[in-house]
C-alpha cells in the first residue's frame, strides 16, 4: 500500500513540475503527450549518465578504480603542446613548459594510484627535423626540468631513467641526465622513464646488432636467442616492467609514432582528443577506467 501511495505521489509531483516548466502556469491545461514526454526525460537521466560513462565522457572518480586491476606500467605520448599554445595565443615554448608541468602532475598521480612505472615520449628521433630554435628550446627545457626536480624525485623516492640515443644531445643535458640517474638509482617503488631521441625501430636494430656482436665473441649461441634475450637488449631493460600495460596518446592522433614498437605488442591503447597540457586528473581516471573494463587476452581465447 505504501509503495502504491509513493508512486502516486511521485506521479503527482512530476505532473505539477511538468506544468510549471512547460507552461510556467499551473492552471493552463496540458496535453497528455507533453506530460508523458517530460516524465520520460526525467526518468531517463540515469540512463543518460550510464551512456556517458560508457562513451568515456562521464567524469569518473578514484573510487571507481580497482587496485588489483591497476596497470603496472603506463606509457604516454604527450601530443598537443604546440596546438595548445597556439589556441591560447602563447609561444610554442610556453606550450612545452605547460606540457612539462603536466607530466609531473600526471606521473605523481599515477604513482599515488599504485602504478609502478610511467614512461613518457619526450623527444623522438624524428623531432630533430623540427625548427632549430624549437629543438634548442626543447633541449633546454628538458635540462631545466630534470635539474630542478632532482631533489623532488629524491624526496618522492622516484627513480628516473632516460633512454634513447644520447650521443646527439647537448653535453650539459647529458651531464644532467647522468646526475639525476645516479641520484635516484636506488629507488625501487616508483620509476619514471623519459625517452629522448628515441626510435622504436632503432631500439630493435641496436638490440639485434648487440646480439650479433656477442654471438661473434662466442658469448651467446643461436639457440640462446629468444624473446627474453631481445627484451634484455632493448633500452627498456632498465625497468622491471618493460612492456606497458596501457599507452595513452593525447590530442586526437591515433598512431604510436615509432614509440616502443616491440614493447607495445599487447598494450592496451587509449586515444584522447584532449591536448596534453589539458590532460588532467579526470582524463587520466577516464583512461584507467577504460583500461580496467577491458578483457586482456594476449592473443588467446578465454
Swiss-Prot record:
GO terms for molecular function: rubber cis-polyprenylcistransferase activity. GO terms for biological process: protein glycosylation; response to cold. Its cofactor is Mg(2+). Transmembrane segments: none annotated. It is an enzyme of class 2 (transferase). PANTHER family: ALKYL TRANSFERASE-RELATED (PTHR10291:SF25), DEHYDRODOLICHYL DIPHOSPHATE SYNTHASE FAMILY MEMBER (PTHR10291). PROSITE patterns: UPP_SYNTHASE (PS01066). CDD domains: Cis_IPPS. It comes from Arabidopsis thaliana. This is Dehydrodolichyl diphosphate synthase 3. HAMAP family: ISPT. Keywords: Transferase. Its EC number is 2.5.1.-. GO terms for cellular component: endoplasmic reticulum. Belongs to the UPP synthase family. Catalyzes cis-prenyl chain elongation to produce the polyprenyl backbone of dolichol, a glycosyl carrier-lipid required for the biosynthesis of several classes of glycoprotein. It comes from the Eukaryota. Pathway: Protein modification; protein glycosylation.
Amino acid at each position: 500500500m505504501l509503495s502504491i501511495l509513493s508512486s502516486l505521489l511521485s506521479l503527482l509531483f512530476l505532473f505539477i513540475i511538468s506544468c510549471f516548466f512547460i507552461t510556467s502556469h499551473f492552471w493552463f491545461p496540458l496535453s497528455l503527450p507533453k506530460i508523458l514526454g517530460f516524465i520520460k526525460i526525467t526518468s531517463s537521466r540515469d540512463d543518460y549518465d550510464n551512456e556517458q560513462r560508457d562513451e568515456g565522457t562521464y567524469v569518473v572518480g578514484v573510487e571507481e578504480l580497482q587496485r588489483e586491476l591497476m596497470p603496472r606500467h603506463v606509457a604516454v605520448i604527450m601530443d598537443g603542446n604546440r596546438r595548445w599554445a597556439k589556441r591560447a595565443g602563447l609561444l610554442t615554448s610556453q606550450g612545452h613548459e605547460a606540457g612539462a608541468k603536466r607530466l609531473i602532475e600526471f606521473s605523481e598521480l599515477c604513482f599515488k594510484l599504485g602504478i609502478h612505472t610511467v614512461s613518457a615520449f619526450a623527444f623522438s628521433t624524428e623531432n630533430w627535423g623540427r625548427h632549430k630554435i624549437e629543438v634548442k628550446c626543447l633541449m633546454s627545457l628538458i635540462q631545466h626540468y630534470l635539474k630542478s626536480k632532482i631533489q623532488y624525485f629524491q624526496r618522492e623516492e622516484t627513480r628516473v631513467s632516460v633512454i634513447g640515443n644520447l650521443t646527439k644531445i647537448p653535453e650539459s643535458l647529458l651531464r644532467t641526465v647522468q646526475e639525476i640517474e645516479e641520484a635516484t638509482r636506488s629507488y625501487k617503488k616508483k620509476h619514471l622513464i623519459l625517452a629522448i631521441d628515441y626510435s622504436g625501430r632503432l631500439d630493435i636494430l641496436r638490440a639485434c646488432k648487440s646480439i650479433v656482436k656477442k654471438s661473434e665473441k662466442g658469448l651467446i649461441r643461436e639457440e640462446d636467442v629468444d624473446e627474453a634475450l631481445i627484451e634484455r637488449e632493448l633500452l627498456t631493460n632498465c625497468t622491471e616492467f618493460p612492456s606497458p600495460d596501457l599507452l595513452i596518446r593525447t590530442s586526437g592522433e591515433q598512431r604510436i609514432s615509432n614509440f616502443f614498437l616491440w614493447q607495445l605488442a599487447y598494450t592496451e591503447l587509449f586515444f584522447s582528443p584532449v591536448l596534453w597540457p589539458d590532460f588532467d586528473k579526470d582524463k587520466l581516471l577516464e583512461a584507467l577506467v577504460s583500461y580496467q573494463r577491458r578483457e586482456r587476452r594476449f592473443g588467446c581465447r578465454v
